A protein has these predicted regions:
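N-terminal segments that mediate ammonia production and transfer
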Residues: 1-34
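ATP-dependent adenylate-handling active sites, centered on carboxylate activation for C-N bond formation
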Residues: 26-188
Length: 188
């Protein structure tokens, strides 16, 4: 069994020994030039609409994961404004963490019912084998990012009625927010 990629196509050969060629082409409509303010307004409106779509008409208790960073703070702010009830927010980190500090500032400003989950380095490392089993990955970056999410999800499931959990994931990928993206070529 193998997969081989060619220019504009790929070939699959599976156990049946049949070869299938798939050709993919993309066409993009030319968009009119807009002012920077129009682009920013479009991002703002679509961002709010994406959160609204997940919050409006939601019958279940909502909570937000709040790191204190820009992405989760913006999402939490929108959820808080759209929600009919005071929302819960949760943060997780090591004692003295900057994330916990800034998450508390945002939570206080928004008036959320905020919970800080403070973990030790030992607890973090102890849980890695369990997380690897659950996420079915040994990828270092994935595991590192998943341990905190796993622990905060476990805490919420045991200590909260929240059934819908919203976070800021995806914004960095969409907007090129990771530090290593700054070294990427301009064409990205």
């Amino acid at each position: 069994t193998y997969m081989h990629f060619k220019h504009n196509s790929h070939t699959n050969k599976w156990k049946s020994n049949k070869v299938r060629y798939v050709y993919t082409t993309f066409s993009f409509r030319k968009q009119p030039e807009l002012k920077m303010e129009d682009y920013l307004d479009g991002v703002r409106k679509n961002f709010i609409e994406a959160v609204k779509k997940r919050v409006e008409n939601c019958e279940r208790p909502i909570a937000c994961l709040l790191s204190g960073g820009l992405d989760s703070s913006l999402v939490t702010s929108i959820v808080s404004k759209l929600s009919k009830k005071r929302i819960e927010t949760f943060s997780i980190g090591l004692k003295g963490s900057e994330d916990l500090k800034y998450a508390k500032i945002v939570a206080d400003f928004l008036g959320t019912n905020h919970t800080e989950i403070v973990i030790s380095e030992e607890e973090f490392f102890e849980r890695i084998p369990e997380v690897i089993k659950v996420i079915e990955s040994y990828d270092t970056t994935t595991v590192r990012a998943s341990v905190g999410n796993y622990l905060v999800a476990e805490y919420i499931s045991q200590n909260s009625n929240a059934k819908v959990i919203i976070n800021g994931d995806g914004s960095d990928e969409l907007m090129g927010g990771y530090l290593y993206f700054s070294a990427a070529p301009d064409s990205m």
